[in-house]
């Protein structure tokens, strides 16, 4: 009897196995020729579920949504630099959400790179600006170890997307082995000196506020925020946050206003601004004669902890330092009645508050029409709201796809504008293929309405015919029902409040994805 030879791992197998060893359970992929051995490695790794996405922006947005639900990174599989660039907008959004994500980017075999083949590019130069960490596994011995490093780096010091480049020959050569197991890095604990300084500043302030994000927006974190509110500190969230626990039984913080002048007016008179789990607030854009830093005159900003800190623990420590025994009230369930008449953003918000089931995840890419839905669901059944953090529209459907696959037993609602939805409508195909429990609500106004608003705010003048063509989505109008059904997702039009309310009730009751094209006024 002869001994059977021991099969060694390929570089691709070492990479995939290492990520699985570290708890990665999802891969959102749009592979090409250079990634074929990674595809095979995924086929042999039952711990990771692979989902095909027809556009890289869907893959990266879905990985973001998956991680926002699970708290651990998902893997993306992207085809060289061009594939990375296609997914770049939603990687940018994930970076702004501090979302851990491991982007595996295939590349040409190392000996082939010097020939400048048509798909050759500077992958490091392209991926570097949006990556917290980036390395290339140029030898098979590096593949597993760099995969472990990538996973670890996605958690910090500041969480976010990382990029691991895998040349084709590294993927196919044997001699790989899994990387050494890493422990998950923790967010930084509160700094006692900063807590004491903040408590002292609060006691001498007349109108203190605190801006929060991160773990402070979990259910447990909001319970601590309610204690801070009871101590006399106004609590506000960032304008856009990765995820917030909301609805009945949860404390309702205020939210920073979007427009600079509105935010400054809202904060007028504040003399102390504490920061926990985020950064000093700044305006989304510069406008003539408007401030960029949203701190009122006479107000002192004080950083207690940035995005790399456990902001829920900061709030608890601050409340303790202030001797707070009470807590501010939480939201009570208040479901509105059925809306009637014309269909508009307020009617849609009322229907969402009526029918959204407990435990629902909401992916908000609603742009100009999203605010009423946010406000009207404050006292709805308990749910989690996920927002567009980086301003690159087209995140809504991919984020919802990833969230749904991370929590298939919970419903996910996507609200998106028709302009935003067209960036990544291919997510519908993946939803249909996976049977994702996503209800998509598309605000159809045949316009980039937010840009019409911004045109006036920037002082760019009155739009003429050419400007109107650049800001409108008519000629031809997009038929969202046909677009959705062509990708396997049942859909319906709604033109009145009654039609929308009935369609939404049916959509939440159904299994699998649904889409409602909600026809709302352009202005």
What annotation goes with each model-predicted range?
Residues 236, 363, 415-416:
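Generic enzyme active-site microenvironment
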């Amino acid at each position: 009897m002869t001994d059977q030879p021991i099969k060694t791992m390929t570089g691709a197998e070492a990479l995939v196995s290492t990520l699985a060893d570290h708890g990665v359970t999802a891969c959102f992929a749009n592979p090409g020729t250079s990634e074929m051995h990674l595809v095979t490695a995924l086929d042999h790794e039952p711990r990771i579920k692979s989902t095909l996405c027809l556009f890289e922006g869907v893959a990266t947005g879905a990985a973001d949504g998956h991680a926002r639900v699970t708290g651990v990174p998902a893997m993306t599989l992207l085809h060289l630099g061009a594939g990375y660039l296609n997914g770049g907008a939603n990687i940018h959004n994930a970076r702004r959400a501090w979302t851990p994500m491991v982007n595996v980017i295939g590349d040409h075999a190392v000996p082939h790179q010097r020939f400048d083949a048509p798909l050759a590019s500077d992958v490091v130069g392209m991926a570097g600006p949006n990556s917290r960490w980036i390395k290339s596994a140029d030898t098979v011995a590096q593949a597993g170890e760099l995969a472990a490093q990538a996973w670890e780096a996605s958690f910090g010091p500041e969480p976010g997307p990382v990029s691991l480049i895998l040349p084709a020959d590294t993927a196919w050569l044997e001699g790989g082995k899994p990387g050494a197991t890493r422990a998950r890095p923790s967010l930084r604990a509160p700094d006692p000196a900063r807590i004491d300084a903040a408590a002292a500043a609060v006691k001498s302030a007349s109108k203190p506020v605190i801006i929060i994000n991160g773990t402070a927006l979990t259910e447990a974190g909001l319970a601590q925020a309610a204690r801070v509110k009871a101590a006399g500190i106004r609590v506000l969230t960032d304008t856009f946050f990765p995820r917030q626990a909301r609805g009945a039984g949860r404390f309702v913080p205020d939210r920073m206003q979007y427009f600079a002048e509105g935010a400054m007016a809202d904060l007028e008179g504040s003399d102390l601004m504490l920061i926990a789990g985020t950064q000093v607030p700044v305006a989304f854009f510069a406008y003539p004669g408007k401030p960029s830093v949203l701190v009122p005159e006479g107000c002192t900003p004080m950083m207690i902890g940035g995005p790399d800190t456990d902001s829920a623990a900061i709030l608890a420590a601050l409340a303790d330092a202030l001797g707070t025994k009470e807590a501010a009230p939480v939201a009570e369930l208040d479901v509105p009645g059925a809306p009637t008449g014309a269909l508009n953003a307020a009617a849609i918000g009322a229907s969402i508050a009526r029918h959204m089931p407990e435990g629902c995840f909401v992916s908000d890419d609603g742009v100009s029409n999203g605010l009423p839905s946010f406000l009207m669901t404050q006292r709805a059944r308990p749910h989690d709201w996920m927002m567009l953090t980086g301003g690159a529209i087209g995140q809504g459907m991919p984020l919802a796809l990833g969230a749904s696959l991370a929590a298939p037993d919970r419903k996910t609602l996507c609200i998106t504008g028709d302009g935003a939805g067209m960036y990544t409508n291919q997510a519908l195909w993946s939803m249909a293929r996976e049977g994702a429990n996503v209800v998509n609500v598309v605000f159809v106004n045949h316009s980039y309405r937010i840009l019409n608003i911004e045109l006036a705010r920037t002082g760019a003048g009155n739009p003429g015919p050419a400007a109107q063509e650049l800001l409108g989505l008519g000629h031809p109008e997009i038929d969202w029902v046909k677009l959705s059904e062509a990708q396997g997702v049942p859909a319906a039009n709604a033109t009145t409040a009654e039609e929308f309310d009935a369609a939404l009730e049916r959509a939440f009751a159904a299994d699998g994805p649904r889409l409602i094209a909600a026809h709302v006024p352009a202005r």
